[in-house]
Amino acid sequence: MAADISESSGADCKGDPRNSAKLDADYPLRVLYCGVCSLPTEYCEYMPDVAKCRQWLEKNFPNEFAKLTVENSPKQEAGISEGQGTAGEEEEKKKQKRGGRGQIKQKKKTVPQKVTIAKIPRAKKKYVTRVCGLATFEIDLKEAQRFFAQKFSCGASVTGEDEIIIQGDFTDDIIDVIQEKWPEVDDDSIEDLGEVKK
């Protein structure tokens, strides 16, 4: 007797998936997906490109489009039939106005293009060479730092936003090396400051 009660109470439950199945539906269901937004056509109205989705549906599946327009409210249908082509064009123009430019880049301040080289004393008889101004010629400082470290077989590091420190006294050789590696840096734009204190 208890088995009969549990079976009958299970059939009356609202959340039972067996009761939610439609009797007139043919399983497995065939769902039509939109070619514009890739969602089922019932959900196209929730996407930002409703006009494009409707145009695609009308062009490719006129029967389904007719069903959807009959099911829609008269306000939506009237809005679409009045200016279907112009509404889509207006939406497209609005989107182009809103998003096209992206982030505006700030103009760089015109800084004189000058490379300065200085020899800075460290402890006892040791020196470091400071190279400033390579960034004004749009030279990648990390690449320049690696190049100097490899060329002079020493340590080099990028310390400031436009400053490279090379361990050792290379003020004599570095001018020729810079002009050889980066020909856009001419002899007039390189200035040797000599020995400078930190």
From Swiss-Prot:
Coiled coil: none annotated. InterPro entries: DENR/SUI1_TIF, DENR_C, DENR_eukaryotes, DENR_N, SUI1, SUI1_dom_sf. The modification N-acetylalanine is found at residue 2. One of its GO terms (molecular function) is translation initiation factor activity. GO terms for cellular component: cytoplasm. GO terms for biological process: formation of translation preinitiation complex; IRES-dependent viral translational initiation; ribosome disassembly; translation reinitiation. Residues 95-110 have a biased composition (Basic residues). The keyword Transmembrane does not apply. The modification Phosphoserine is found at residues 20, 73, 189. Its main location: cytoplasm. Residues 72-110 are annotated as: Disordered. Keywords: Acetylation, Cytoplasm, Initiation factor, Phosphoprotein, Protein biosynthesis. The modification Phosphothreonine is found at residue 86. Induction: Up-regulated with increasing cell-density by HNRNPD. Up-regulated in ovarian and breast cancer cells by ERBB2 overexpression. Not induced by TGFB1. Highly expressed in heart and skeletal muscle and moderately expressed in the brain, placenta, liver and pancreas. Weakly expressed in the lung and kidney. Belongs to the DENR family. Translation regulator forming a complex with MCTS1 to promote translation reinitiation. Translation reinitiation is the process where the small ribosomal subunit remains attached to the mRNA following termination of translation of a regulatory upstream ORF (uORF), and resume scanning on the same mRNA molecule to initiate translation of a downstream ORF, usually the main ORF (mORF). The MCTS1/DENR complex is pivotal to two linked mechanisms essential for translation reinitiation. This is Density-regulated protein. The gene is DENR.
